[in-house]
Amino acid sequence: QRESVCELGIAVVEDGQVTETRSWRICPTPNWFHPGNIRVHGITVHDVAESPKFDTMWTEAKPYFEHANVVAHNASFDMSCLRHVLSKYDLAFPSLSYTCSLQVARRAWNGFRSYGLGSLSQHFGINLRHHAAESDAAACAQILIRACQEHVVSDFSEIGSTFGLRMGKLYYGGYEAAGKLRKDGKTCSAVATTGRVPG
């Protein structure tokens, strides 16, 4: 259930440097965890029992997302979770642009056996506590910074043209999924409305 978010982590990047990291534990509704998910992230029902619900936490986290350029590793999944949980609580989507560090990495470096966050972090000597949201966010940021430095990308707006990607967008009432640029210059993407827009 993609609306069942139990932790949110961010890393703020300014002038090519990570300047701030934060995370929030969240008590999902209902507060139940599949054993397989617990094995992945290590968070249990008891760990979040006293944590705020997403809508309460979002008042603190939203300013980091509004009018921001956002990056996630396997962004299609993370952004889907964000859309689902915002819709669950009838919260408006923030206005943001996003891209995927996984897709950037695949285009920035050839020949890696795996482009997962753990493998890339190990290869580049990035300290990572995998599946801890704050650490994942910081590692994702550092991977994108490295890719941009090596390919002389100086601005977020240049990522799409450099790596053959279309930026995704969230906005009030809908979203445009990130996509790959085709050889004919067109994009493979989806545009949708939420169907649940707060009044």
What do these predicted ranges mean?
Residues 145-199:
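Acidic two-metal-ion nuclease catalytic site recognized across multiple nuclease folds
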Residues 133-147:
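Acidic, divalent-metal-coordinating active-site segment for phosphoryl/phosphodiester hydrolysis
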Residues 1-96, 110-131:
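Conserved non-catalytic scaffold segment of RNase H-like nuclease domains
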Residues 95-105:
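A short, structured active-site edge motif that brings together acidic residues
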